[in-house]
Amino acid sequence: MTVQTFIPNGAKAASENTVTQPTHTTDVSIKKLYIETQGCQMNEYDSHRMADLLGDSHGYVLTNNPNEADILLMNTCSIREKAQEKVFSELGRWRKLKEQNPDLVIGVGGCVASQEGDNIQKRAPYVDMIFGPQTLHRLPQMLDQHHAQVEKPKKEKIKLVDISFPDIEKFDFLPEPRVEGFKAFVSIMEGCSKYCSFCVVPYTRGEEVSRPLDDVLAEIAGLAEKGVREISLLGQNVNGYRGETFEGGICTFPELLRLVAEIPGIGRLRYTTSHPLEFSDELIQCYEDLPQMVSHLHLPVQSGSNDVLKAMKRNHTIDVYIDKIAKLRKIRPDMHLSSDFIIGFPGETDENFAETLQFIKDLDFDHSYSFVYSKRPGTPASDLPDTTPEHVKKERLAQVQQVIKQSSIEKTDAMLGKIERVLIEKVSDQDPNILVGTADNTRLVTFVGDASWVGRFAEIEITEIKTLNLVYGELLNLEPDVA
């Protein structure tokens, strides 16, 4: 599980997994909000929007210190059992803060809230508000309701739980997103209709619902006008996007990419998370036609064994996946590929695992999110017999991660002497003459340059490999501002 604590611009992050926010103030008269984000980039996006909502409606500013907050919000993830239990562990710590400050408001959102709203009320009755991913836009109203009934007797208080699955109305109530830096996430759809046997997402975020095309394009155009140069399109099954057009038609994901690429100012496009079934030839063609598309793709496969894929109800074979990647790499030979792997799925044999390990070697993955299978209540896979010892699963996982780590090291080393297109994001904290940016493949690139170049793209020749994710280079060409 990734835990991301929202911190203000200029503050030091406690870890790499942080998201910066508007400048923090020590003025005690200012109402302060602390958000802990667990899990995926969709949750990260949602947490940004929570901060925007409460900032606009009630004047809250973000703090990186839960001890000084007036509101504590936890945006939760239920993808694995360990992540779910960590929610209650953290809530136990927050309970102590509420005992010290009875006026403290505690809210729980995200997928655990959606799945276990009633259970949260029972196990943590001190939680004041519970809301799901599709109802976060109602946070200001829930907060008002909470304050309105603070003085009421306990038996007269209304339980503030809203974990329903309304249509994608939340985007109609969200304020204009704040811009921080030159990258931005844009959610284009919610939910998933694939119903893989191991996954809780359809039950916690609902069926697939796409945002209208015009809404998506308007949000991205607004971000570009504010200086954003890289857009990451988000969805649980993002390439299944089918947004309604103003004329009443349907826009597919490849068509959306082409329209976004036409927006002035947008110089780089990413997206996550995809499903192989909708990784179509039309989508692959975008990599040939649109220079804004990065040579980096996250395409979850989960297993390299057809038997396991069938049990997972992924509805495709390994050959289908391999064929799609072959087509893509014919267009982009330098394509960096990442994926998700579930190790130790019920019924996975030694032979099945060997197939997965060989598949990983053959496809030459650059990165992965790989975990031992975690049984999720209510999913079909939770009823499957699981006879593989836990220590065997962990040994298999270690093998997978070692193979992918070695591949990643080799890919970083191979950058030496090559030219990378880099989005310059900031001046180094250590040296005002050094600029820091990211390459298509997500590696950090540093080089000597002028602070006025921040926000532009540059061609950098890589001259030194520093670490797995950090390289040094020299400027070859500074591109004109794409705005």
Curated annotation (Swiss-Prot):
Tree of life domain: Bacteria
Lineage, highest ranks first: Bacteria, Pseudomonadati, Pseudomonadota, Gammaproteobacteria, Moraxellales
GO annotations of cellular component type: cytosol
UniProt name for this protein: tRNA-2-methylthio-N(6)-dimethylallyladenosine synthase
Protein source organism: Acinetobacter baumannii (strain AYE)
Domain Radical SAM core residues, every copy: 178-410
Subcellular location: Cytoplasm
Keywords: 4Fe-4S, Cytoplasm, Iron, Iron-sulfur, Metal-binding, S-adenosyl-L-methionine, Transferase, tRNA processing
EC number in record: 2.8.4.3
S-adenosyl-L-methionine is among the record's keywords: yes
